[in-house]
């Protein structure tokens, strides 16, 4: 069953910026573009304007996600990914980018695609304080407790989680 697209009011802060758009059918995120050119040296970050502001319907929020190609090819990440755009916010959407590449600078030109905007329905909740939470299969297991990566497993004391290779990596000269 296909639903009708949600109408979201949008104002161009920069009259020349292309509207956010989905690159392919079925994409979850619409591409956001920067309205300013910028060069980031290794380790630098910047707040880039997108030239758009939105009015989301009550009960919705938008989330600014990184573009995987920028991460894979250039080492660009979003500092607060995902960034949250609340329904009541009317200011320009801005994206906080950081260059994580240790050697190469990255350059953004005006209207380069820098992030994706995902609009989702969100629930408001009422928090109810209790003395004890009900049991669950996971209990208090967190941060690597489910394994799935070579660096996440039993440490030398047989405890699950943690990074048993951290001391090996940090003891290498020059690292």
Curated annotation (Swiss-Prot):
A family per Pfam: dUTPase
CDD domains registered for this protein in UniProt: trimeric_dUTPase
Coiled coil: none
Keyword Magnesium among UniProt keywords: yes
EC class: hydrolase
Family from the record: Belongs to the dUTPase family.
UniProt-listed NCBIfam families: dut, PRK00601.1
Protein known as: Deoxyuridine 5'-triphosphate nucleotidohydrolase
Annotated source species: Streptomyces avermitilis (strain ATCC 31267 / DSM 46492 / JCM 5070 / NBRC 14893 / NCIMB 12804 / NRRL 8165 / MA-4680)
């Amino acid at each position: 069953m296909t639903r009708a697209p949600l109408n979201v009011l949008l104002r161009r802060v920069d009259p020349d910026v292309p509207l956010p758009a989905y690159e392919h059918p079925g994409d979850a995120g619409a591409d956001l573009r920067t309205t300013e050119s910028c060069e980031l040296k290794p380790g630098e970050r910047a707040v880039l304007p997108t030239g758009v502001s939105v009015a989301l319907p009550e009960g919705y929020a938008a989330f600014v996600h990184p573009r995987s190609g920028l991460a894979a090819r250039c080492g660009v990440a979003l500092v607060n990914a995902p960034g949250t755009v609340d329904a009541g916010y009317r200011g320009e959407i801005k994206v906080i980018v950081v260059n994580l590449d240790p050697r190469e600078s990255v350059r953004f030109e005006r209207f380069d695609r820098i992030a994706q905007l995902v609009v989702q329905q969100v629930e408001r909740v009422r928090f109810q304080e209790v003395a004890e939470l009900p049991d669950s299969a996971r209990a208090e297991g967190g941060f690597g407790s489910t394994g799935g990566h070579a660096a996440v497993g039993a440490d030398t004391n047989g405890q699950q989680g943690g990074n048993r290779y951290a001391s090996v990596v940090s003891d290498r000269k020059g690292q």
